[in-house]
Amino acid sequence: MVFDSLKNKVGGMFGSEEEEEEEKFLEGFEIKSASNDIIELPDVENIQDLDVTYPLIKPFANAHIFWDDEQEDVIYRIEEPELTEKEEEIFRRLKRAMEKKIDVSLKELNSTDKIVGYLGSRIKEISEELGMTIEKENMKKLMYFVYRNFAGLNELEPLMHDPYIEDIGCSGMEIPTYVVHSKFGSIKTNLI
C-alpha cells in the first residue's frame, strides 16, 4: 500500500506511464503466423478453376493462388496491405532512422511480442523526434512493414509462414521467385 502510494507520486520513474503509452501506441497490433493453422485446400480437377486464398500472417498477408489466363499459368500472389504515397514516405523516413536506432540484435529478443514491443518503441521514439503524427490504422500497416523488413526476410517473409511451401527459389535479378507448393507443385510468385 505504501509502495503503491509512492509509485503513484513518482510515476514515470517506474516506467508504468511509459509502458502504458507504448501499449496504447501499439494497441490492436499483433503478428499472428498462420503456419501452425490447419488450412484445408480444395481439390481442383481442372487447374484453370484454381482460385484459393488463405492467411499467412494474420491479418496482413495472404496467399492467393489462381490460374492466370493471360500468363496461362498458376500464380502465387502474396497479398499485403498497400501503402498510400504518404504512408510510403513515412515508411522510408522510419526505415532510414530505424537503421541507425536499432541497438540490439533482434535474435536476442526471443519472442515475436518482444520484437514487436522493441520495434514499436523505436517507431514511437523516431516519430516523436521527427514530429510525425501517425494515425492508428496507418500505424498498424507501417508496423507490419517494419516488422517484416527488420525482423523478417522483407518480401519473402510471408512465404516463410506458409505451411505448404517446401522450397523457395530465385534464379537471379528481375526473374520471378518460384515456390514449390506441396499441393500445387512449382508456382511462379508475384515477387521479383
Segments predicted by a language model, with ranges:
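N-terminal "pre-motor" subdomain/linker immediately upstream of P-loop NTPase catalytic cores
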Residues: 35, 51-65, 69-86, 95-192
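Non-catalytic terminal/linker segments enriched in charged/polar, low-complexity residues
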Residues: 1-32, 108
